[in-house]
């Protein structure tokens, strides 16, 4: 008689149902044939079942990796701490290169207050919104789940990594289809630590991070070079009607005298400092060693953390506070969990403004006068001796004046309170019931004050009319709040029929989110120190209070079934039906599904006794996921009441044309994968190929105001993302005292537009007809091309005889005239391969590790060449190549047009470059104090480490990075002690 052993485990942190494969005892003959294989399988499924890498946490339930048909990347909290201990989103890129935090031009740098609003997993599957002639940004984010409950990206951005037990990225239909209409951009599931049983433990962690601004991408001219450039460009020549050659000569001589006297102001350093962050985390875990009456056990944990960050730009900062408790009460049948968390974030923007202002300031200007006062305006008149008349003044606003003398500021405060409650009931050995309830409230306040002495009002300085005075100074105050109520019920069934295992889940959930917001602007501040809104005289001219109120309800039912035969052949099915108030009246619900297969080849008899292959599995899955990237008012008509009365009634105008046929876009996912482990798990590899097609892409179209409304939302295009990703790890040395591990991962994704609507084609025609008025490349929707395709006019380079650019028109002829209709695809901003190489060495109590990011094959449009070498403002500083590499005389073979040519350069293939990039993401050294040394003390564990992030960045494309806020290199000191 065969004995059946059924294992059902539960992950305490998420209250998720965990499925393990049932084991059936073998006959003597089977034991002999498969002894080694079964030993490995049972170890994976039982002994190591709770370890990261052996259990896939989906948020609703968990499965052993050997029974999972989907694609998931798993990272432990400890592994994340080794790469980046302060920014979880940046750290995830190291473990999964298909997880991309998008900042295409590197605008935001290391701004601590920039919350990523575009994160892609396996490519872009959402079309951007468009106006009548240009591209608009769109927010694309994966779903973030913490302990089974959905949270926003800011919650993850500010999360204390010390609380994290594991992170799982779900990337295909079999992994994420159970999330239905939310899963098209992927799912990130975070599991926090749970109290340890039978002991009291106190853990304290301190991080101290130094940030050093990285200005290596800037190649600006010094004072002498700027003056030489301006001279050669004819800035001081009297070529305009009415200009006086003598006065212009005076201007040049004044600037030259300043240069010869040694004036060479390095403006880039003025708003910068060494940033510093100190972060403290305290976690207390308690659990009585003895059970309460009835076998009831209690576990309790409390967490408290504080982070103070002063950014690399003076005055910028971000303070975060977290506090919470987790209580678990359980017996042999029922377990109740309650998790209460509070968080608060205070942020402030730098009063020094955008960093790009400092990259433009002329270095032959001084920031202070002879008395040490900061200049309000930078001009040659500041340098000229008294009585000297000037022509060209080259005036510009001092970028430091407002920060030094005025009291303008921009701050925000956000608070969140969340309570998650869960109950698990083990009804029988085969049947379990799980219920969850969550209540979350967010409130935010934004304050922005502009002093009446700001440059914004400089033109009114001479005016003393009351109306002009009442327009000086501005205070904008905004409030927003959001309350989310969520509930779910899930039942699971697991049974084994000999070698045939059946696992099933049936669940339902509902969520309601209520949002409110208001904002208004007041003006008329009579003094710089009157920096609160109550000092204002009136509302902004023609202004009023704006705001909104909305309520979104969603509900879904889902079913997941898993069938397994002998832990060799597995089939996984998921079905979900979603309903949402976001949908149009004609499309109230949308179905989603997935089907997956897995073959554990290593469990076959013909693999028994293999000394090389310890694991080999093939899997494939298909299915659908969805996206709800729009608001409720886009499915119904919206009106605004007019303020004037006609016939005793208020009139109304339509502001939004509703689309009753609007439905969530659907992505059809197809994935095949391979998993293998060789030589006793020394070599582990995973490879996945995917082909995802998104149908009915949601796009906002901005239309002519004459229609009576501004925009409408429609399902207007189909996309495909095709590619592969892989992960390889190898341990050449694995002894008791020495462990060496090498990792390599990579990804390639190609995006293709399959179908566009007539409205999108009209947008293309409009762009090609007039060039949209932009000098830089404009996005176009073209079937067969990528969303990342660069459109420009083909160029033959600069004519050595004239210094003008030669173009190739659409008929193949050469011409000096740029025409928008000649724009063609000239490159695709998609790397051939992007990934990370890692090396980790552990020797006794010491650890050292590093990760390098590589990328090659992408075409990029070099905006620095376009805007800081050509299309330059001659009265500002520019890239040094504007002086050294622009055409100056007939016969010059130059990359850039004539130095005296100040006409606008438009999108051209000259500025498209092929990139190869290598950067060091992290370098870490750690020491773990031997437990023998700590014996007899209150300390049970002591770990010290130092981690450097972003130490270098090397690229074949040289362009400025961090234009709004500079990038930084950071060094973090970490100390963790457990009592």
Predicted regions and their residues:
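Extracellular/periplasmic, surface-exposed regions of secreted and cell-surface proteins
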Residues: 320, 326-334, 339-344, 390-450, ...
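Short, polar/charged loop or turn motifs at beta-strand boundaries
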Residues: 70-95, 104-109, 119-126, 149-155, ...
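Short, acidic, small-residue-rich periplasmic hinge/interaction motif at the N-terminus
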Residues: 22-81
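Residues embedded in well-ordered regular secondary structure
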Residues: 65, 71-74, 78-85, 95-120, ...
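Short acidic/polar hinge/loop motifs at secondary-structure boundaries
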Residues: 89-90, 94, 134-136, 142, ...
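Conserved small-residue
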Residues: 203-260, 519, 714, 731-829
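Transmembrane beta-barrel wall of Gram-negative outer-membrane proteins
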Residues: 268-350, 357-377, 416-420, 498
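Extracytoplasmic gating/loop element in the C-terminal half of outer-membrane beta-barrel translocons
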Residues: 456-458, 855-942, 948
